[in-house]
């Protein structure tokens, strides 16, 4: 009977590996910009970006904003956006219409939302306490739609709650421009 144990152990290990591989094959692929509806992407690319965008945090007026663009960051980085201070849980709205292109949690931005907007611009909302419940990649949002809530996730966990808002003209994370002059 003791000679059956190695055989059973090998079968159990093989079964585990097969189940693990099957589970990995059934997991959905990670969302990407290429999975967005092509017709809506083209429609957005054909639109012009407004010269004035609303401040995307509820109750915050432009005159209280501080231009934090270009400030030094760790690892020889510079700040590619503006930080908008507000109490945790304050509503964050889309500054433009567009497609929700990415929702994730990462080390730098914490909980983030990427929206592809007019003229192929990309709008980055970071350090969120949470995304709006039910918000999904591929959703079409209008200017002023709720997308999340102010927080201090990611590398901002030891700072006051705020929204980091970034604007990119050459693709997701490429061609950063100062969003401060756009916000009204």
Go through each PLM region and give its residues.
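Zn2+-dependent peptidoglycan hydrolase active-site motif and core
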Residues: 95-137, 162-164
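Conserved, short, structured surface segments that act as functional micro-motifs
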Residues: 114, 139-184
């Amino acid at each position: 009977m003791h000679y059956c144990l190695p055989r059973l152990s090998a079968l159990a290990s093989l079964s585990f590996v097969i189940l693990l591989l099957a589970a990995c094959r059934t997991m959905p692929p990670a969302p990407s910009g290429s999975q967005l509806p092509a017709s809506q992407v083209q429609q957005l690319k054909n639109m012009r970006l407004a010269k004035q965008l609303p401040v995307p945090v509820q109750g915050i007026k432009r005159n209280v904003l501080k231009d934090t663009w270009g400030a030094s960051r760790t690892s020889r980085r510079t700040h590619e956006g503006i930080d908008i201070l507000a109490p945790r849980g304050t509503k964050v709205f889309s500054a433009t219409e567009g497609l929700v292109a990415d929702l994730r949690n990462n080390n730098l931005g914490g909980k983030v939302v990427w929206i592809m907007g007019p003229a192929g611009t990309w709008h980055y909302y970071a350090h969120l306490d949470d995304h709006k419940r039910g918000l999904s990649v591929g959703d079409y949002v209008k200017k002023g739609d709720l997308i999340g809530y102010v927080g201090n996730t990611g590398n901002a966990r030891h700072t006051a709650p705020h929204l980091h808002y970034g604007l990119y003209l050459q693709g997701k994370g490429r061609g950063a421009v100062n969003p401060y002059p756009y916000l009204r």
